[in-house]
């Protein structure tokens, strides 16, 4: 990730989250800060269900995907499109989709921040074009 990232101004994220519970907003902002610290060259996209981060040099939100912050009614998910292929030594990732995996976060206090940082770091370095995601996980 040698390019320059693109993150939305904070007020746009605040507007996006304005109707979400404050406890979930805190989780989203902490995850966003984590991504910005680990992958400052990432591009941030505001999507209907949350925020998406990707390496624009590798592709869009799927091919170049790093992670997504999905905001649900009572929790936040830190999701990885290529989660089935990234190292998860603590076994945090769950999900039934072919490749996508996520970590469900219900409170700021119970979130495993160090482990989440490790997952984001691993995902930021994962390139599906060189690793091959055509087989089974």
Segments from the language model and where they lie:
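Charge-dense, helix-prone N-terminal extensions
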Residues: 1-137
